[in-house]
Amino acid sequence: MSTHRPRIAVVGAAAAGLAAAEGLRRLGWDGEIALIGDEPHLPYDRPPLSKQILSGAWEPERTALRDTEQIAALGLDLRLGTRALAYDPARRVLTLGDDGHTELRCVGVIAATGVTPRSLPGTDGVEGVHVLRTLEDACALRRRLATPGRRLAVVGTGVLGAEAAAVARALGHEVTLVGTGDTVMERVLGAEVGGLLADVHRAQGVTLRTGQAVTGVRAEAGRAVGVVLADGSTVEADDVLLAIGSDPAVGWLRGPGAGTAGPDLTDGLRCDEFCAAAPGLYGAGDIARWYHPVLRRELRIEHRMNASEQGLAAARNLLAELDPERFGERRPFTPVPYFWSDQYDLKLQAHGVLTGADRIEVRTLGKDPLRLAALYGGDGLATGVLAIGLPPRRTRGLRALIATPVPWPEAVARLADAVDA
């Protein structure tokens, strides 16, 4: 008789994967848990990479989410520095890229492999060209910024690019922020609030080249010396940070065995409201595109809080699928999404969904344009709210505005009451 315990594999050893593994144990799973990550590190926190690590305020080890004793207490089959190559959903067999291409037979898999940063053609191996996704990425750019007086070109005006530009400028470097939008973080914040944030960067000494596409990196002797813009001009730089978005890390789910009946991998791993992509296969974190039944739309959210919350939800629902008598019924994953960004002395906090809004209402607190609340909506409903420079009490109160869908006129009236209270 076989003595093997049933195994659940969690593929991805960052915040979502850790939350899933911890959730499985906390909820009572006594079978094996394989936690597989392609980086050599124990699970660590990514948001500090573009802030405290890049600035030098933290040493790398401070990003660890758990220490070795806490990880050991989970009783995991921990496989770090190991890449998943393929998953066969019919056989429930996971293939790993270590020596011999190990196959793991699983009763369930939680996919939490996150995203991979985009690059530009012809930049592989060019000294001074950076992306910012891993601890090694952050430490490499940090070492470059330890030399005073460098010129940094940041390509991409989203959250990552804006945060990195703020850190580099605070360190005293010459920073140029280049993007195709007209403002900073425009896709998320909209033109009005994005314009205010762009003014903050300019006031801090950042040069903005907005409405500009980058066609390539100019290199001499294998080293970056600038970026070339679509208008033919060049931004001279000693270092170039590419913050031009990312792609869901779903390649291993396309591997042998997935076949034509495999999961939908368009813009991530498509999941239902329970985070399930197929029987026994669940998604969590940046990789997961799931249906939010309260908001009645599909979402894929690349934010830290969502990663942890969805990791736990995926664990709970996988267990409920495997043994409903023991673990109960599955529950829809219906969070109120949250993210924050620190730039200079500003803290931006957002609840709900801001992207894709067709209307935005901005209310300032007093005469300071950088103490504000902004309401975001679509299809006649309020969907998200942003706070900049507001006290915690007011920020917490704003979340209630969009926790459930509210008609736009009612939400606008409540926004005024919340800000003026």
Predicted features and spans:
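C-terminal catalytic lobe of FAD-dependent flavoproteins
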Residues: 7, 225, 233-265, 344-421
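Rossmann-like NAD(P)H-binding beta-loop-alpha module
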Residues: 140-189, 193
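Mid-to-C-terminal Rossmann-like scaffold of FAD/NAD(P)H-dependent oxidoreductases
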Residues: 4-6, 289-392
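FAD-binding core/adjacent interface of flavoenzyme oxidoreductases
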Residues: 1-9, 65-153, 228-230, 239-243, ...
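Glycine-rich Rossmann-fold phosphate-binding loop(s) that bind the pyrophosphate
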Residues: 12-16, 38, 133-134, 155-160
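FAD-site-proximal beta/loop scaffold in flavoenzymes
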Residues: 127-148, 223, 233-313
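Beta1-alpha1 glycine-rich phosphate/pyrophosphate-binding loop at the start
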Residues: 2-76, 165-188
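A Rossmann-like FAD-binding core segment of flavoenzymes
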Residues: 30-32, 78-98, 104, 171-273
